[in-house]
């Protein structure tokens, strides 16, 4: 199933769709490094993304990065509500040369982000690295996920961010995996 949403503000104009059919993705955020990270997201999560974004990137990349995170989170929440039987929890460690990242995802209905990652530099190219946390906070809050992101070791900032994106994507993919269990994956009987 394809989930689609548009978001138009004074700062950004977004048209985003997400699906779990592994169809080809098309990502155009206007921010090269973010395009790269979201391409990794699609590959490692098993989800397809189509993104057409315009924003005030002449100011900086903040609004487009955060707003894309908001919409991806909202679309994930719609997808999760349609899925009744899924693993719920996902954990992944990803190494990238000198870097090691760990991400734990719980599709809990309780939005929380622990972002424990001190990135080595403030920029990768022109991309402000502080936007990595802003992106994940927007996704996690809007998808209502509990997520712990830990950068255990680092060195190269590009590797650090890439390992975090890959670990999140893999952990989310595991958590979304369908099961044959007919019960809601919560002892409460509900995930809201």
From Swiss-Prot:
InterPro entries linked to this entry: IGPD_sf (IPR038494), ImidazoleglycerolP_deHydtase (IPR000807), ImidazoleglycerP_deHydtase_CS (IPR020565), Ribosomal_Su5_D2-typ_SF (IPR020568)
Task: State if Cytoplasm is listed as a keyword.
Answer: yes
CDD domains for this protein: IGPD
The question of whether Transmembrane helix is a record keyword is answered with no
Q: Where in the cell is it found?
A: Cytoplasm
**Gene Ontology annotations for the cellular component aspect, listed alphabetically:** cytoplasm
Its primary localisation, in coarse terms, equals cytoplasm
* Entry EC number(s): 4.2.1.19
Lineage top rank: taxon: Bacteria
Q: Name one GO molecular function term.
A: imidazoleglycerol-phosphate dehydratase activity
Q: In which pathway does it act?
A: Amino-acid biosynthesis; L-histidine biosynthesis; L-histidine from 5-phospho-alpha-D-ribose 1-diphosphate: step 6/9
UniProt-listed SUPFAM superfamilies:
Ribosomal protein S5 domain 2-like (SSF54211)
Query: Family assignment?
Result: Belongs to the imidazoleglycerol-phosphate dehydratase family.
In Swiss-Prot or TrEMBL terms, this protein is called Imidazoleglycerol-phosphate dehydratase
User: Species name for this entry?
Assistant: Staphylococcus aureus (strain MRSA252)
């Amino acid at each position: 199933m394809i989930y689609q949403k548009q978001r138009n503000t004074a700062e950004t104009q977004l048209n985003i769709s997400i699906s779990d059919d592994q169809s080809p993705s098309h990502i155009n955020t206007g921010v090269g490094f973010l395009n790269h990270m979201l391409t990794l997201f699609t590959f490692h999560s098993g989800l397809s993304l189509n993104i057409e974004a315009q924003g005030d990137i002449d100011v900086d990349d903040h609004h487009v990065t955060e707003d894309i995170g908001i919409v991806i989170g909202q679309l994930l929440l719609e997808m999760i509500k349609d899925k009744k039987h899924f693993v719920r929890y996902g954990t992944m460690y990803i190494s990238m040369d000198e870097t090691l990242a760990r991400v734990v995802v719980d599709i809990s209905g309780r939005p929380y982000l622990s972002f424990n990652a001190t990135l080595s530099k403030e920029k990768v190219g022109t991309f402000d690295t502080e936007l990595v946390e802003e992106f994940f906070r927007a996704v996690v809050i809007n998808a209502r996920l509990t997520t712990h992101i830990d950068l255990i070791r680092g060195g190269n900032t590009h590797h650090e961010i890439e390992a975090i994106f890959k670990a999140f994507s893999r952990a989310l993919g595991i958590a979304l995996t369908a099961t044959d269990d007919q019960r809601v994956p919560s002892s409460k009987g509900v995930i809201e």
